[in-house]
Amino acid sequence: MGKIGKAVAVRARAFDMRILYHNRKRIALKEEKTMRVEYVDLKTLLKESDFISLNVPLTEETKHLIGRNELSVMKPTAFLINTSRGPVIDEKALVEVLRARKIGGAGLDVYENEPSLTPGLTQLDNVILLPHVGSGTLETRMKIGTLAVENLIAGLEGRIPPNLVNPEILKMRSSL
């Protein structure tokens, strides 16, 4: 369970939820006990959970981590929440499951083919779609502001900005 998963668990605990988790690496038993969380395999987590929050990086291993098979074992009242990376969910399969009302609903802040949306997703009344704002915490906004100022100062001092996205343009400009 990573940093984000632990933060979600703390919030879920405030609602007296039973917290199941699945992760590549199990946390220490002492930490599980302190956090009051239970490590289970993915299938058990999907079968037993009312709310499933995905908090994983996008890797070859996690691409389409949730697909047709995984969605089929979820409770008909379960809600799937994805604030991690869009391709973690096979959205075509999700649209089918939501349309057939085989799960309770979904909340998405990220999308498989961002900025495009999977056809049918916006026509569903059992999904909440957000414009990729899950990172909009005070902490991240402060870091974004700090990075912007650092980039401006570097540019004004004639240095290469630390977060330069397109260095080829800078090279072209200096050759003019």
What are these regions (language model features)?
Residues 114-176:
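C-terminal helix-to-coil terminal segments
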Residues 8, 49, 98, 148, ...:
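Hydrophobic "lid"/C-terminal helical patch
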Residues 4:
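Hydrophobic/small residue at the entry helix of a nucleotide-binding pocket
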Residues 16:
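Short glycine-rich hinge loops at helix-strand junctions in the catalytic core
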Residues 22:
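The conserved SAM/SAH-binding core of class I Rossmann-like methyltransferase domains
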Residues 8, 12, 74:
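Aromatic pocket-lining residues of Rossmann-like dinucleotide-binding sites
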